[in-house]
Amino acid sequence: MPRSLKKGPFIDLHLLKKVEKAVESGDKKPIKTWSRRSMIIPTMINLTIAVHNGRQHVPVFVTEDMIGHKLGEFAPTRTYRGHAADKKAKKR
C-alpha cells in the first residue's frame, strides 16, 4: 500500500543533507548510503547514489522515471544462481 499523500515522501535526514550539499557544490561523486527505505525525490536527479545491498554499495544513477520509488528497489539483495541441474539427465 502506498504512502499517504498527506504525509509526503520519506527521506532520511542525513541523506537529504548529503544530496543538498552535492547539488549545491555540483559534485558528481557517488553518495554512499545504507538508507534503502528513502524515497527518490526530484532533487536527486542526475546524481549517483551508492545504495548498500547488505554486502557492497551498488551505484544507482537517478533518472526522472525513478522519482517516487525507493532506493532499495534498484539495489537487489539476493543473487539467483539457478536451480541445481539433474545429475541423472546429464549422464545420458
Swiss-Prot record:
One of its GO terms (cellular component) is cytoplasm. Transmembrane segments: none annotated. This is Small ribosomal subunit protein uS19. InterPro entries: Ribosomal_uS19 (IPR002222), Ribosomal_uS19_bac-type (IPR005732), Ribosomal_uS19_CS (IPR020934), Ribosomal_uS19_SF (IPR023575). GO terms for biological process: ribosomal small subunit assembly; translation. Belongs to the universal ribosomal protein uS19 family. Keywords: Ribonucleoprotein, Ribosomal protein, RNA-binding, rRNA-binding. Protein S19 forms a complex with S13 that binds strongly to the 16S ribosomal RNA. The gene is rpsS. HAMAP family: Ribosomal_uS19. Pfam families: Ribosomal_S19 (PF00203). SUPFAM superfamilies: Ribosomal protein S19. GO terms for molecular function: rRNA binding; structural constituent of ribosome.
